[in-house]
């Protein structure tokens, strides 16, 4: 029995729009990944600083034990 190949590509090109033409360059790098670690260390540092920020905010909100010596008068 022979295998039948069906072409699934659309026969029409679709409509072009001004917005599509503007946004097309933003999608040109889709799927490409730079080799190596890239900006991963910077993201790790940013996440660490954000975690410290959240801990400070939580301690201020809860008047934590670590801030017993600091007087806060709202």
From Swiss-Prot:
Q: Which positions bear Phosphothreonine?
A: 3
Compartment(s)? Plastid, Chloroplast thylakoid membrane
**GO CC, one annotated term:** chloroplast thylakoid membrane
InterPro entries the UniProt entry points to: PSII_PsbH, PSII_PsbH_sf
Q: What is the similarity comment for this entry?
A: Belongs to the PsbH family.
- The protein's assembly and partners: PSII is composed of 1 copy each of membrane proteins PsbA, PsbB, PsbC, PsbD, PsbE, PsbF, PsbH, PsbI, PsbJ, PsbK, PsbL, PsbM, PsbT, PsbX, PsbY, PsbZ, Psb30/Ycf12, at least 3 peripheral proteins of the oxygen-evolving complex and a large number of cofactors. It forms dimeric complexes.
- What's an example GO BP annotation here? photosynthesis
| UniProt keyword list | Chloroplast, Membrane, Phosphoprotein, Photosynthesis, Photosystem II, Plastid, Thylakoid, Transmembrane, Transmembrane helix
Q: Which GO terms describe its molecular function?
A: phosphate ion binding
Asked if the keyword Chaperone belongs to this entry, the reply reads: no
Q: What kind of modification does the protein receive after translation?
A: Phosphorylation is a light-dependent reaction catalyzed by a membrane-bound kinase; phosphorylation occurs on Thr residue(s) in the N-terminus of the protein.
Record HAMAP family: PSII_PsbH
What membrane topology was assigned to this protein in its record? Single-pass membrane protein
User: Where do the TM regions start and end?
Assistant: 41-61
* Biological function: One of the components of the core complex of photosystem II (PSII), required for its stability and/or assembly. PSII is a light-driven water:plastoquinone oxidoreductase that uses light energy to abstract electrons from H(2)O, generating O(2) and a proton gradient subsequently used for ATP formation. It consists of a core antenna complex that captures photons, and an electron transfer chain that converts photonic excitation into a charge separation.
Report the protein name in the record: Photosystem II reaction center protein H
């Amino acid at each position: 029995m022979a295998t039948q190949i069906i072409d699934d590509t659309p026969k029409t090109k679709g409509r072009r729009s001004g917005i599509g033409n503007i946004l097309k360059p933003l999608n040109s790098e889709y799927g490409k990944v730079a080799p190596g670690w890239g900006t991963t260390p910077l993201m790790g540092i940013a996440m660490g600083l954000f975690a410290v920020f959240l801990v400070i905010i939580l301690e201020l909100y809860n008047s934590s034990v670590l801030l017993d010596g600091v007087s806060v008068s709202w």
